[in-house]
A protein has these predicted regions:
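Positively charged n-region of N-terminal signal peptides that target proteins for export
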Residues: 1-4
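Short, compositionally biased low-complexity segments
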Residues: 30-35, 174-176, 309-311, 342-354, ...
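Feature captures C-terminal
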Residues: 24-26, 36, 49, 54, ...
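Extreme N-terminus of proteins, especially the signal/transit-peptide cleavage junction
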Residues: 16-23, 344
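Bacterial N-terminal signal peptides
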Residues: 6-15
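Alpha-helix initiation and N-capping motif
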Residues: 56, 97, 123, 248, ...
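Hard-cation-handling environments
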Residues: 307, 311-402
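Acidic, metal/ion-coordinating pockets
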Residues: 20-321, 364, 368-376, 386, ...
Length: 539
């Protein structure tokens, strides 16, 4: 596989030796910002002494530089975001995206593709933000079905005519939103298959005279590119089962004729693009939370009107970390963001407790953070067992002082807690359904689970204990979980029927339970206690 990519780049370089006139386009791209436009600390670089990140104000400085660079060279410039712009920080969440869209207006974004988290608090929020945006809001595969008529919820595409070349950008939102959002929040919305939608709008843009077609997708590049590519080849060999794509890697394999793709949804940055070895589409993706900006200069042959190569602006690759000492914060943008931050963060920086150790999400089956959260859920609701989904747990907590701001960053979604009486057999079936595809995607408390991945589906939970004893199939247990899972999201369809029949919903916010738990038990020191063990786990 790596050999094939090397051959492709050798051929690409050889082709550039006999070029005619060329023209360049610089693209700056962000994804999964999740409200991260304010300043923050780069704890992922150095947990003990983190460098300062300038957020949107540092991005504004870099964007201004890139625009000037393009102007002096006569190049084109394009600024894109591929979704999940606001939900995740106080600045983003408390303003319901207003502060983020104002920032995007100020720095001159060309387009924003709707992400699944845009619908976390209802469709009215993205609808309002679309009216505030001075740029195109894209999604070719979301349809409003109100009144039985299918109409586009957002614009399907953007066409930019640079004179030298006409470039079309088609936006795609993950159809998995229907599994990840509350049903009420996406009422009367239809998410069409990504594969057929992208193919159709590729043809539309070509018919409208676009020389270059760019796909901007809120459908991500995977964490492990080689494992995922093996899966793509396997699925292709077996025959595609639907018109929905599992990830961007599959999408570009199934839809040829896309010149460039920018991805989002999965928070892993690719310093160098993934290039599909069959269709040769380069795919780019950055890290999330506004920590970086992706910047690439693409070169096109004006005779063939084809992409002939690209280059980065730094040796490390395409992703530029927005450190404030390297990119001083733009004063005007900084003032706008800091004013909002000062208003929404009042009281959120007060001390509520301490942690003896860093509380991280690291771990295949359990983690310090997951154990803390589920233990807090169990404590608050006086349950027997507790479960929550890993996807709702967004960051780590450093050692030392803990504030409400820290807890909010970990749990930015307004999930509430509920309880339901279930049998031991139901708990086991619930877990079996979650491990059928490998990992569980769950954090738990009150139980000890042992999973053997090598066993057939439905038989992988080889040990389940509650109260330190083997689970009794027909005994009743009080299960604590979130309203999100009680609706059947994140693969928990088995819970959906119980919500209306037997669930008791408290209205207590999940993060408030964690706040109270930390206050009550401070200083805290969560431990890994073997509550979730996986045999045959991949390293």
């Amino acid at each position: 596989m790596k050999h094939l990519l090397l051959i492709f780049f050798v051929l690409l370089c050889a082709a550039t030796a006999c070029l005619g006139e060329t023209w360049s386009l610089v693209v700056c791209h962000s994804n999964d910002v999740h409200g991260g436009v304010d300043s923050s600390e780069a704890t992922f670089m150095n947990p003990e002494f983190p460098p300062q990140l300038g957020g949107g104000a540092s991005a504004a400085t870099l964007i201004s530089y890139m625009r000037h660079y393009c102007h002096t060279k006569g190049d084109g410039f394009l600024l894109l975001d591929t979704g999940d712009i606001f939900q995740g920080t106080l600045v983003g969440t408390k303003t319901k995206g207003d502060a983020v869209v104002r920032y995007m207006n100020e720095v001159g974004y060309d387009a924003w593709v709707l992400g699944n988290h845009e619908f976390d608090v209802g469709r009215a929020v993205p609808e309002k933000l679309m009216t505030e945006a001075d740029f195109s809001v894209l999604s070719a595969n979301i349809y409003d079905t109100t009144g039985g008529v299918y109409t586009h919820f957002a614009k399907p595409y953007l066409i930019k005519d640079y004179g030298k070349l006409k470039i079309g950008v088609v936006g795609i939102t993950t159809a998995g939103t229907v599994r990840e959002a509350f049903k009420e929040n996406i009422k009367n919305l239809y998410f069409a298959p990504e594969v057929t939608t992208l193919a159709a709008y590729r043809d539309t843009l070509r018919a409208l005279g676009c020389d270059i077609v760019i796909a901007a997708t809120h459908l991500g590049l995977p964490f492990d590119r080689w494992e995922a590519y093996d899966d793509v080849e396997k699925r292709e060999k077996e025959g595609w089962k639907s018109d929905y794509a599992k990830n961007t890697m599959e999408l570009v394999r199934r839809v040829p004729g896309i010149d460039i793709l920018f991805a989002g949804d999965i928070h892993v940055g690719y310093q160098e693009p993934w290039v599909d070895p069959v269709n040769h589409t380069p795919c780019f993706q950055g890290y999330g939370r506004g920590t970086n900006l992706l910047a690439v200069e693409f070169e096109f042959d004006l005779t063939t009107r084809k992409l002939i190569g690209w280059k980065n602006f730094q040796d490390e690759g395409t992703l530029i970390t927005l450190m404030s000492d390297r990119f001083p914060r733009d004063r005007s943008v900084a003032q706008s963001i800091d004013t909002v931050a000062g208003r929404v963060e009042k009281g959120f920086n007060d001390k509520i407790g301490e942690s003896v150790i860093p509380i991280t999400r690291t771990g295949e089956g359990e983690s310090l953070m997951g154990n803390l959260i589920c233990d807090a859920m169990l404590w608050k609701m006086k349950g027997d067992v507790a479960i929550t989904n890993k996807g709702g747990v967004r960051t780590d907590i450093h050692a030392g002082t803990i504030t409400p701001h820290d807890v909010f960053d970990v749990l930015p979604f307004d999930n509430t807690l509920g309880t339901v009486e279930v049998t031991g057999a139901f708990v086991k079936d619930l877990l079996e359904a979650k491990v059928i595809y490998g990992g569980s995607g769950l954090y738990v408390s009150g139980m000890r689970v042992k999973v053997d991945r090598s066993r057939p589906a439905g038989q992988r939970v080889i040990s389940l204990e509650i109260f330190g004893k083997p689970v009794v199939a027909d005994s009743s247990y009080r299960l604590v979980t979130t309203d999100y899972l009680l609706e059947g999201n994140s693969g928990m369809e088995k819970l959906a029927s119980l919500r209306s029949q037997a669930a008791i919903e408290s209205g207590v916010y999940m993060r408030d339970a964690v706040l109270e738990y930390i206050k009550e038990h401070s200083p805290i020191e969560p431990k890994l206690d073997g509550r979730w063990q996986t045999l045959d786990a991949k390293p």
